[in-house]
């Protein structure tokens, strides 16, 4: 139980930076959707889909590889870190140089011939973020969650501050005293300033992480790197397939919609409503940051029965909290929808589908521990490729007829298939007796409460939200009672 408390503590700290950071970024969505029409916001969504894919490729699974080998008694952790750092620095630099050389054909292939500067800025951002992934991983390895959180939050704060400066303050200054900022501000640059802000904040993050790149002897162990790449290569394929499962729909959507002139509009609508489901993504991300170091340290230190129980408990509480998040977002959607402009409301129907898809992905991530601990990472690659096949097939089949709804359906089917496949194979290769009856119980309770809350015949929105709050309290009460979690005495009226 102590290990679960440690995991919960780290999840809370990592989650604070992840949740606050993503929430602050989330708060930018109203600004973007109010300032830019759907077709322009669609360009932002479209380009960041490529960014997510490029970042996975440029880190090539080295974060997980670092945790695996740094916790290996036969390897020197600092040599592992140094080798990883040098490797990422080399590949990130090479990526940036090659992109600058071939910027014209790359921009054309991305339908960005008119704005190659967008591509260059995002490429530099990706190169820096890929490299700094290793210092961030080192902070996690050292259990320096607070330092990790502070750097992340400063990065996000600067990014948001620059967005507000360029998009809101600069137009005001330019209208009154244009000569004061005309040397760097272009009024018509629009969404380009979103990319400028991101690039500057990434450079600042690199500077803040310099202490994690000093104070040790740099060593490059080629044989160690070969072993790490052999371990991490399947994770790269897994990561590429996984991120394509998350972003490929937004890349494919403009190519598959029946009305090409409406393509970026649909991407913008879908991307904005996808952001509403970010709460589930935030929780999964926070859990992931704490979970990977946790499972490797448990595997190294705990006995078999204790570590297996820890894995089972982690899955149980993950499912409970995820279902609670799902109900919360869906019950308060009448309020949360105002995080996007009314012109984007037509896409709200995708929110419950995307929320469940992200829940399935979170469970899949929890299940992934068996092939990481047994060095059978090729299975993660197989599952992700299976999911990618489902994503591509269903997008091609559904998007021409259903538009972005086809993307949402493809997403939930993709993660559902991956989740089931990982569970079935894992039962045979690394048996963990997950409490399926308990998971089924909470799923049924969640489904019943969801149906009651959504289809409740109440017209008054305030009353409706109050009743839905009661339903949320019912779910929490059931979980507390079933899991024998004591309430604080002051809440239950005891002295």
Language model segments and positions:
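Membrane-proximal transmembrane or re-entrant/amphipathic helices at the cytosolic face
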Residues: 453-495
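Helix-loop junctions and terminal segments of transmembrane helices
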Residues: 58-74, 273-315, 370-373
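Signature of the first transmembrane helix
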Residues: 3-63, 91-103, 125, 160, ...
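Interhelical loop/hinge segments that connect adjacent transmembrane helices in multipass membrane
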Residues: 1-3, 7, 174-193, 206-246, ...
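Interfacial segments at transmembrane-helix termini and the short loops linking adjacent helices
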Residues: 103-122, 264, 329-359, 365
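Hydrophobic alpha-helical transmembrane segments
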Residues: 120, 150-213, 385-390, 404-425, ...
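N-terminal membrane topogenesis motif
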Residues: 1-26, 75-82, 222-238, 312-316, ...
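Transmembrane helical elements of multi-pass membrane transporters/channels
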Residues: 10-25, 194-209, 213, 222-297, ...
């Amino acid at each position: 139980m102590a290990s679960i408390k440690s995991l919960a503590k780290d999840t809370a700290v990592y989650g604070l930076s992840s949740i606050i950071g993503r929430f602050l970024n989330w708060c930018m969505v109203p600004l973007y959707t109010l300032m830019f029409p759907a077709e322009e916001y669609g360009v932002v969504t479209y380009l960041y889909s490529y960014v997510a894919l490029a970042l996975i490729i440029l880190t090539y699974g080295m974060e997980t590889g670092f945790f695996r080998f740094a916790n290996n008694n036969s390897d020197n952790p600092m040599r592992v870190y140094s080798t990883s750092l040098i490797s990422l620095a080399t590949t990130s630099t090479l990526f940036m140089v090659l992109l600058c050389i071939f910027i014209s054909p790359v921009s054309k292939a991305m339908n960005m011939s008119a704005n190659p500067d967008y591509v260059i800025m995002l490429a530099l951002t990706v190169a820096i973020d890929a490299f700094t992934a290793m210092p961030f991983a080192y902070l996690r390895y050292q259990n320096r969650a607070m330092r990790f959180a502070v750097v992340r939050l400063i990065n996000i704060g600067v990014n948001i501050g620059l967005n507000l400066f360029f998009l809101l303050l600069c137009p005001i200054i330019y209208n009154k005293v244009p000569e004061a900022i005309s040397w760097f501000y272009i009024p018509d640059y629009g969404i380009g300033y979103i990319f400028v802000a991101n690039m500057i904040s990434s450079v600042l993050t690199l500077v803040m992480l310099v202490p994690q790149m000093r104070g040790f002897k740099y060593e490059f162990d080629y044989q160690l790197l070969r072993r790490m790449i052999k371990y991490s290569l399947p994770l790269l394929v897994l990561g590429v397939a996984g991120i394509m499962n998350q972003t490929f729909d937004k890349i494919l959507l403009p190519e598959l919609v029946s009305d090409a002139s409406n393509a970026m509009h649909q991407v913008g609508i879908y991307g904005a409503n996808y952001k509403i489901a970010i709460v589930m993504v935030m929780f999964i991300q926070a859990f992931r940051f704490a979970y990977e170091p946790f499972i490797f340290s448990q595997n190294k230190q705990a006995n078999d029965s204790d570590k297996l129980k820890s894995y089972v408990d982690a899955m149980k509480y993950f499912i409970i909290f995820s279902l609670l998040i799902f109900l919360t977002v869906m019950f308060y959607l009448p309020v949360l929808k105002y995080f996007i402009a009314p012109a984007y409301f037509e896409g709200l129907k995708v929110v419950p589908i995307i929320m469940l898809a992200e829940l399935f992905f979170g469970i899949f991530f929890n299940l992934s521990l068996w092939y990481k601990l047994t060095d059978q990472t090729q299975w993660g690659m197989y599952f992700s490729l299976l999911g990618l096949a489902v994503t591509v097939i269903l997008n091609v089949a559904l998007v021409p007829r259903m538009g972005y709804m086809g993307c949402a359906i493809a997403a939930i089917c993709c993660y559902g298939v991956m989740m089931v496949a990982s569970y079935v194979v894992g039962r045979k290769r690394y048996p963990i007796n997950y409490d399926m009856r308990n998971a089924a119980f909470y799923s049924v309770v969640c489904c019943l409460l969801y149906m009651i809350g959504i289809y409740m015949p109440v017209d008054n929105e305030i009353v409706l939200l109050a009743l839905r709050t009661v339903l949320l309290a019912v779910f929490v009460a059931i979980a507390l009672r079933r899991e024998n979690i004591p309430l604080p005495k002051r809440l239950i009226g005891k002295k």
